[in-house]
Amino acid sequence: RQRQMCIRDRLMSTAVASEFAHRLLDAAPGTRFLTIKDDGSTFASQRGYAELTTFADHSREPSDMPALDLDEVLDGDCLKMVARHPDLPIEELAARAASVGMADEVHVTTSGKPMLEISARGVTKDSGLSMLCDHLGIDRTDTVAFGDGANDVEMLAWAGDSYAMANAVPLALAAARHRAPSNAEDGVAQVVEQPVGMKVL
């Protein structure tokens, strides 16, 4: 049977991305930005961004990232924008991002890496899971979610059942109904093995 994939893009407009970026620059001078466009394969990085990142952050070599002017980075609607700062801790950068007053237009979160992830309002993991369930005809009560980062919070709260990993951030621990062993202990596999009585290799 032919497989089908259901994709719905909810893009952040150039105007919104530009407004947020410039407000954040006012609040945290020196912030560097990257935008992810098209199907997620196109990265537009500001000059100086690559020096702040590693392969693990985006699954690509920093040396392969372009060094663009900010106007070029912000040119065109994007799936997501990433912001990072050479000196400020991520908690401080997040606090300054929250102070710019655009919560009605953007969603700002973190994933455990030293960078902010900014998307259009309503673009969260729970909205993606909800779309997938609608497409597949799966009831929300039949879903189970696992997470460890701040960007998992909405999904953990939305799912019919949810587990935060033992190494999760406090927000994720508070949002989940249960705890799972840590990522290092293969916590997801341990939980999944229990009801089905089999080993996940």
Please report, for each region that a protein language model flagged, where it lies by residue:
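Mg2+-dependent phosphoryl-transfer enzymes with acidic/Ser/Thr/Gly-rich catalytic loops
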Residues: 117-201
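Short, small-residue-biased leader/transition segments that mark boundaries at the very start
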Residues: 2-7
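Active-site-adjacent loop/tail segments of enzyme domains
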Residues: 10-18, 22
